[in-house]
Amino acid sequence: MEYLSKQRYDELAAELKYLVNEAYPKAAENLAEMSAQGDRSDNAGYREARRIQAKTISRIRFLQNILEHSRVIDPDALPKDRVSLLSRVEFTNLSTNTRMAFQIVSPHEMDLEAGKISLKSPIGAALMGRKVGEIAEAQAPSGTLRLRVESITLD
């Protein structure tokens, strides 16, 4: 079971709708056109059309699986005093005295450029359930990170 924000669920549902209603029919039509051009063994256009159709089908199945096995998170039901899914947490790396802030999200919402880390990442997992002032330890490739929670907010 995966948990998604309402926004991310809607984005994935919209992508699925586009793929099913527009991209797949276009890919199937293109494949039929390329197939009608004769010898498939020497038809690069046919092979490319088939690759695009297979990629589209794969993405459709992937999105269907995510949406079928996901639940939308109710932000009002989340704790406000502990790090949880959708929490924006500011913390200090005690080894380097560096302050950072990230939002904890599901793996399907992770986007480092947008400041979103997965709850399954080493840092996300270590911070989950912590309160302000508590210290978490995360295992990273560079060694153990000691992180002190400075603030927690829900966006």
Set out the residue ranges of the language-model regions:
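N-terminal cationic and glycine-rich segments that engage phosphates or anionic surfaces
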Residues: 1-58
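Generic leucine side-chain signal with a strong bias for well-ordered alpha-helical environments
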Residues: 12, 16-19, 31, 63, ...
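Conserved NTP-handling cores and scaffolds of large molecular machines
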Residues: 20-23, 67-71, 131
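Short alpha-helical linear motifs
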Residues: 37, 68-75
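Amphipathic alpha-helical coiled-coil segments
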Residues: 57-71
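Non-DNA-binding regulatory cores of transcription-related proteins
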Residues: 73-155
